[in-house]
Design a protein with these regions (language model features):
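An N-terminus-focused feature that recognizes amino-terminal "leader" regions
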Residues: 1-66, 287
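Vicinal oxygen chelate
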Residues: 5-14, 44-50, 54-56, 66-165, 168-177, ...
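Catalytic micro-motifs at enzyme active sites that drive phosphoryl/nucleotidyl and oxygen chemistry
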Residues: 32-35, 73-78, 111-112, 128
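Amphipathic alpha-helical segments
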Residues: 16-30, 98-105, 178-194, 254
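A short beta-turn/loop motif at secondary-structure boundaries
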Residues: 36-39, 117, 198-200, 265-267
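Aromatic-anchored, glycine/proline-accented short structural segments
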Residues: 156-214, 218
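Short loop/beta submotifs within extracellular cysteine-rich repeat domains
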Residues: 67, 148, 216-217, 225
Length: 292
């Protein structure tokens, strides 16, 4: 497998400050705004994890549209206009190996760049492949700093402490037109094996285990399926495991959000609460707990 883990998702937002305030109201602690050197982008993120593993949601915006076009970020501008999750980023250990694997499979790399902080320090190398075979927009990132060091630094900086106690990313989801062909592409090109199948609620789900989280590829089980008319591609959601679902739901309600009642989840022995959508920059946060 050339992918080591699901690193983060990118939520394209028009108003970085306003969107960040919504997530802070939700009970999540975000980093201070940071601009990327020689680019027109700025971000804030929230981390979920511990001293050995992490995942983050990146709120990404543009502070100079003309400069964004000059630097090839028209994809981000389109995503901002559309709203919701733009892309999921997967970590790779070796960017050169990833280039070779993609090239050997005939997959075009549409963006290949290094990313620096505003102070000039190197974040890492980013590859954005064409997405048709994979069913959703993905990117690959190889960091200059090790995961262990990043997690340790973020833990020491309090990045994992939130009023809303999310434990870990459980899964992301994407709706695809050809479930078997898309699953085969993830296996043959990216080295990700099918780890499970789930059926129910009008859906056929293939689970792809990437690190300690899952990417769900979803297709309808028939024309009358409730997901038959869903747009194809990455769903603008992320599911996080929590320990005490009722108390988390109460916290969300107390903060002025309108979470749905606790319901039985699609996954076996699971219960879920959902919040967000239009009230959260077109992003849906799913809280999930598992009965033993």
């Amino acid at each position: 497998m050339i992918l080591t883990r699901i690193d983060h998702v990118i939520l394209a937002v028009a108003d970085l400050d306003g969107s960040a305030q919504l997530f802070e109201q939700l009970g999540l602690s975000l980093t201070q705004p940071m601009r990327h050197k020689d680019a027109a982008t700025e971000n804030q993120v929230f981390f979920i994890g511990n001293e050995s593993s992490e995942f983050y949601v990146e709120l990404l915006s543009v502070h100079d549209r003309d400069r964004a076009l000059e630097t090839g970020r028209s994809d981000l501008l389109r995503a901002i206009d559309r709203g919701g999750l733009m892309r999921v980023m997967m970590e790779v250990d070796d960017a050169d190996e990833a280039r070779g694997k993609l090239g050997a499979a005939g997959v075009t790399i549409v963006q290949d760049r290094t990313v620096h902080r505003d102070d000039g320090s190197l974040i890492g190398e980013v590859l954005i492949p064409e997405t048709e075979l994979f069913g959703l927009d993905i990117g690959l990132i190889s960091y200059a700093e090790s995961l262990v060091n990043r997690c340790s630094r973020h833990a020491e900086g309090g990045r994992f402490r939130h009023r809303l106690p999310l434990l870990r990313l459980d899964h992301l989801a994407a709706f695809v037109s050809d479930l078997d062909a898309t699953t085969a592409a993830w296996r043959s090109i990216l080295g990700v094996e099918l780890s499970g199948r789930v059926e129910g609620h009008g859906m056929l789900i293939h689970q792809l285990q990437v690190g300690d989280a899952v990417l769900e590829l979803i297709a309808p089980d028939g024309l009358d399926s409730p997901v038959a008319t869903r747009p194809l591609g990455l769903a603008s959601m992320a599911a996080f495991e929590v320990e005490d679902l009722p108390s988390c739901r109460s916290l969300l309600a107390d903060q002025g959000f309108d979470p749905n009642p606790i319901t039985q989840g699609v996954l076996p022995n699971s219960e879920t609460v959902v919040v967000g959508g239009e009230k959260l920059s077109e992003f849906t946060l799913q809280l999930i707990s598992f009965r033993s």
